[in-house]
Amino acid sequence: MIKRGFPAVLDENTEILILGSLPSDESIRKQQYYGNPGNDFWRLVGHAIGENLQDMAYEKKLKTLKHNRIGLWDVFKAGSREGSQDSKIGDEEINDFSGLKEMVPKLRLICFNGRKAGEYEPLLRGMGYETKVLPSSSGANRRFSKNRESEWEAVFRH
């Protein structure tokens, strides 16, 4: 089944861009980035910036990210996948990142949320960006990464 990503959430003041892979089924259903309550994204970022993002309404979450100069997007514009696991993504169509420098002139760091998104780190690094691959915020990754919270937190102290 073909799944489509969401539009980028960024503006001319964005300094840090977090790239996921492709929205989960729950996120697609809700039409929200990281809409699956089992995903720790909002908790991890909220902890790092000193905001209780997980208890905010979605639009307020996005406004808070923008206020903190954080943008969201996905590596993939679309892809086929049964279920929500990144390992099941096939027939990927990547987003067009060629215009980022013009659209987001203050962008200084691109972070990849998890291994699948991180496979495209060399592409963005090759475009001249500082990059970092972070442990996945997926709830399924919780037990595999002891330092996950500190790695996410370090990005925002950068």
Swiss-Prot record:
Asked whether the keyword Oxidoreductase is assigned, the reply is: no
- GO molecular function annotation: hypoxanthine DNA N-glycosylase activity
Active site per UniProt: N39
Q: Does the keyword Transit peptide apply?
A: no
Q: Which Pfam families match?
A: UDG (PF03167)
Q: What is its EC number?
A: 3.2.2.-
- Reading the lineage from the top rank, the first entry is Archaea
Its Gene Ontology biological processes?
DNA repair
Alphabetized, the UniProt keywords read:
DNA damage, DNA repair, Hydrolase
Q: Which protein family is named in the record?
A: Belongs to the uracil-DNA glycosylase (UDG) superfamily. Type 6 (HDG) family.
State what this protein does: Excises hypoxanthine, a deamination product of adenine, from double-stranded DNA. Acts on double-stranded DNA containing G/I, T/I, A/I and C/I base pairs, but not on single-stranded inosine-containing DNA. Also has minor xanthine DNA glycosylase activity. Lacks any detectable uracil-DNA glycosylase activity.
Question: What is the protein named?
Answer: Hypoxanthine DNA glycosylase
Supply the source organism for this entry.
Methanosarcina acetivorans (strain ATCC 35395 / DSM 2834 / JCM 12185 / C2A)
Q: What is the lineage of its organism?
A: Archaea, Methanobacteriati, Methanobacteriota, Stenosarchaea group, Methanomicrobia
